[in-house]
Amino acid sequence: MSGLVRISTGARLHFGLLDVAAPFGGCGVMTDRPETIVEAKPAAAYRCATTHAGSTDHWQRAEAIAQRLGSQDSLPKVEVRIVQAAPSHNGLGSGTQLSLAIAEAILLASNGSPVDRERLIAAADRGLRSAVGTHGYFTGGFIAEGLGDDENQKLNRLDERLDMPSPWRAVVLLPKRDKTGAVEDSETVSGSVEQAKFDQLAPAAQRRGELKRVLLDEIVPAIRTHQFEAFGEAVTRYNRGGGELFAAVQGGPYNGTGTTDLIAELLNAGHHGVGQSSWGPGVFAWFPTPKSAWCFCDAWNDPARNAYLVSPKRSGRTVQFD
């Protein structure tokens, strides 16, 4: 094929894992923003360009994916351009969405359609612990995965996929970073740092059972029946319970005093569906209508943080050919 391939995908809010050992499992929701956009087109030789901050990390990520997709002595003959990427290390699953978009863009630009999904996932090299963002890349929606106790495949199966009620919205609160990119009172957790933390933790079979019950008996039915308050209460409790699995390595159910204090402030103000997405520092709260979410954004934006209104995605990534 010839011409430009353009992949657009969103982000994911992770409500928490079921356990700290395989098959892990968990749930979350895909959102429309922050958006990631990757383009690729045939070229005489492989190259990657970016128009977005963080170009070194993005360039290295793209080249690693190209190496997995290339032959022993050459990379795919495509030009990859990262047009837009969600901010990294905020708990929004940006690495998974970017990696999958890069891999799919390279495959489509070099080989044409259709793309073998297993090859795409292998090239992106994601889903080691959580498969929410990987499944959600293709489907959108609320995702629950890894609910079986004996799964041994590399990527957990998709157990539940639901559309969120159309009026519901979430607001993501992200602390503003200093000039070094750090967030006060919050440790960035990824890569080898993340692995080291998991290595310190022991499986928690009883807690897994409790969290699985909340997920299947409370969160899923509340989404299906559009019961907003029941959904919010269950998500808050599930998120805290999942966070307590990591208390030994993050100082409590949430990662750092800043996140802990913000969640307490939100709950004391009476908000619903409040929690930390993944390792944070992104914090979410859910709202029954767009208007209530917008009012919250106006009230809670301040010099220390940004408030972003997001809509649940009802479909997976989009692919365009020019």
Outline where the language-model segments fall.
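ATP-binding N-lobe of GHMP and related small-molecule kinases
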Residues: 1-94, 104-115, 312-315, 320-322
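ATP-dependent small-molecule kinase catalytic core of the GHMP/sugar-kinase superfamily
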Residues: 2-6, 16, 22-26, 115-272, ...
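Short, basic and Ser/Thr-rich N-terminal targeting/leader segments
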Residues: 9-11, 32-34, 76, 128-130, ...
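Gly/Ser/Thr-rich beta-alpha loop segments that engage phosphate groups in nucleotides
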Residues: 18, 30, 93, 97, ...
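Short, flexible, solvent-exposed loop/turn segments with mixed acidic/basic and small polar residues
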Residues: 39, 270-277
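A structural signal for isolated positions on well-ordered beta-strands in alpha/beta enzyme cores
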Residues: 79-81, 284, 308
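Glycine/serine-rich anion-binding loops at beta->alpha junctions
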Residues: 83-108, 129-137, 274-278
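N-terminal pre-core extensions flanking Radical SAM catalytic domains
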Residues: 276-288
